[in-house]
A protein has these predicted regions:
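Helix-breaking motifs and short loop linkers at transmembrane-helix boundaries and internal kinks
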Residues: 66, 98, 119-125, 136, ...
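Residue-level signature of mid-helix packing/kink "hotspots" within the transmembrane helices
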Residues: 52, 80-88, 138, 172-173
Length: 264
C-alpha cells in the first residue's frame, strides 16, 4: 500500500486543497482536464443534440409525414420514459464491461438510431426510433458522472462535472442556429431538411463512439498518457480522499469526548 503522507501535507484541509497541491499534483490534474473533460464535453454536445433535435425537425417533419403535435408529444414521452427506465441497467453494464467499451457501444447505437430517424415514414416508426434512442442513450450521462469519480479527487470533481455539464446550455444556444441552417438544405439530393438534420446531427455520434474506443481508458492505471509517477500521485490523492471522508467525523467525536467541559 502506498504511503500517502509523502505527497499530502501533514495538516490537510480539504477546503483549501487547491492551495496545498504540489507541482506534480497540479500537473496531473491539468492533464486530466485536458485529456478527459474537453473530449467528454464534445460527446455530451452531440448526446444532448440528439435529444432536442426532434423539436427542430418537427417544424417541417410533421407536414411531410402527417404528424400532429400530439404524436410528437408522445414520441418525446416515449424517449424520456425509456431514458429513465434504462439508466440504472446501463450503469450496471458499464461497471461490468468497462467504461470504454460501454460508452463506445451506446454512442454508436444511439447514433445509428438517431440517424435512422431520417427514414421514419409515420408515427409508429418515429415512436420506435425515439424509444431506441432513449434506451441506448440512457446510460451516457450517469455513466460519465460515474466515470469521472474514477479519475478526479473529490475536490476537483465538482469542477469537472460543471465544465462537462456546460455542454447543455451551449448546445441549447447553438442548436437552434445550426439546426436552422441544416433545415434550409431542404431538397438537396432529394432529401427533406429534417432528414438532413437527423443525418448530420446523428451520424457524428457514431464516429465519436468509435473515437471513444481509442481515446478513453477504463481507469487511470490503464492510461498510457499518464506516467508511472502520475499514476502514483493520482492514486495517493484518491486514497487521501477516502481518508478525509472517514477521519473528520471520528476525529471530531473523539475530540468532543475528551472535552470534559462539555459534559459538566
Amino acid at each position: 500500500m502506498s504511503d500517502t503522507s509523502s505527497a499530502i501535507p501533514e495538516k490537510f484541509d480539504p477546503a483549501n486543497q487547491h492551495k496545498q497541491l504540489t507541482a506534480q499534483q497540479q500537473s496531473v490534474i491539468n492533464k486530466l482536464f485536458r485529456r478527459l473533460i474537453v473530449f467528454l464535453f464534445v460527446l455530451f454536445i452531440f448526446s444532448f443534440l440528439d435529444r432536442i433535435n426532434i423539436g427542430f425537425a418537427g417544424l417541417t417533419m410533421g407536414q411531410d409525414l402527417g404528424l400532429n403535435a400530439t404524436m410528437f408529444g408522445l414520441a418525446t414521452t416515449l424517449f424520456y420514459a425509456t431514458y429513465v427506465i434504462f439508466g440504472i441497467p446501463s450503469n450496471v453494464m458499464l461497471s461490468i464491461v468497462g467504461a470504454r467499451r460501454w460508452i463506445a457501444t451506446i454512442m454508436v447505437l444511439w447514433g445509428i438510431a438517431s440517424t435512422a430517424t431520417m427514414f421514419a415514414t409515420g408515427p409508429n416508426s418515429l415512436y420506435i426510433l425515439r424509444m431506441l434512442v432513449g434506451i441506448t442513450e440512457a446510460g451516457f450521462l450517469p455513466g460519465i458522472l460515474l466515470y469521472l469519480t474514477y479519475w478526479f479527487p473529490a475536490f476537483f470533481r465538482a469542477r469537472a462535472n460543471a465544465l462537462f455539464m456546460i455542454a447543455m446550455p451551449v448546445t441549447t444556444a447553438l442548436g437552434s442556429i445550426v439546426s436552422g441552417y441544416i433545415l434550409s438544405m431542404d431538397g438537396l439530393l432529394n432529401l427533406h431538411g429534417w432528414q438532413w438534420l437527423f443525418l448530420l446531427e446523428g451520424f457524428p455520434s457514431v464516429l465519436l463512439g468509435i473515437m471513444v474506443w481509442f481515446w478513453l481508458d477504463d481507469s487511470p492505471s490503464k492510461a498510457k498518457w499518464l506516467t508511472a509517477d502520475d499514476k502514483k500521485c493520482l492514486q495517493e490523492m484518491m486514497d487521501n480522499d477516502r481518508l478525509t471522508l472517514v477521519q473528520p467525523e471520528g476525529a471530531i467525536s473523539h475530540h468532543a469526548m475528551q472535552q470534559r467541559s462539555l459534559w459538566r
